[in-house]
């Protein structure tokens, strides 16, 4: 279900301002574009992004992950390593499997313990100069685990790996500060 405020905003848009964004100079297009850019500004503030132009709208987290994985084909090479956790949702597994298939990279799984927590010591051992990307869920809706993404990002950055954080379940429940996290991508 959707909050009433969301339903009302969508209804108002379709009744009063439905037009292509950034595609016209007529009144409806201008209003739709202003609303779109205002939303970008609000999201930027919500996650403390240093620049609203770093906010990219997609249909959802799955599409965002697919977009990133599809964009990295020329940066990932044979025997490079991509790390994900054993708790990932299918949408944060399959795109990386497909990227590995296209490039010859190796997908490695970060183990978790019986409580559903990342074995952080094993993770830090797994991150090497071959690691090109680390993609992990911030908060697992199946296990209830809140991952130590600050530590995960820091270890990845020490090896110049790209960091992708799946925030689909966390952004609505936890304070997210992308400047403090210093991740490359935070998706929700």
Feature locations, PLM:
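Pyridoxal 5′-phosphate
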Residues: 1-188
């Amino acid at each position: 279900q959707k909050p009433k405020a969301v339903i009302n905003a969508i209804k108002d848009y379709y009744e009063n301002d439905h037009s292509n964004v950034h595609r016209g100079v007529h009144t409806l297009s201008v209003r739709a574009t202003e609303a779109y850019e205002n939303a970008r500004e609000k999201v930027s503030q919500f996650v403390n992004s240093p620049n609203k132009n770093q906010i990219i709208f997609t249909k959802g987290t799955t599409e965002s992950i697919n977009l990133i994985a599809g964009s990295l084909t020329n940066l990932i090479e044979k025997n490079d390593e991509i790390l994900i956790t054993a708790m990932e949702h299918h949408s944060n597994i399959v795109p990386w499997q497909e990227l590995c298939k296209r490039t010859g990279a190796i997908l490695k799984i970060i183990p978790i313990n019986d409580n559903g927590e990342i074995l952080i010591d094993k993770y830090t051992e797994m991150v090497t100069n071959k690691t090109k990307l680390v993609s992990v869920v911030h908060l697992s809706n199946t296990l209830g685990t809140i991952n130590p993404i600050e530590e995960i990002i820091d270890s990845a950055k020490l090896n110049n790996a790209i960091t992708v954080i799946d925030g689909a379940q966390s952004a609505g429940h936890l304070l997210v500060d992308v400047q403090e996290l210093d991740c490359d991508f935070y998706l929700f």
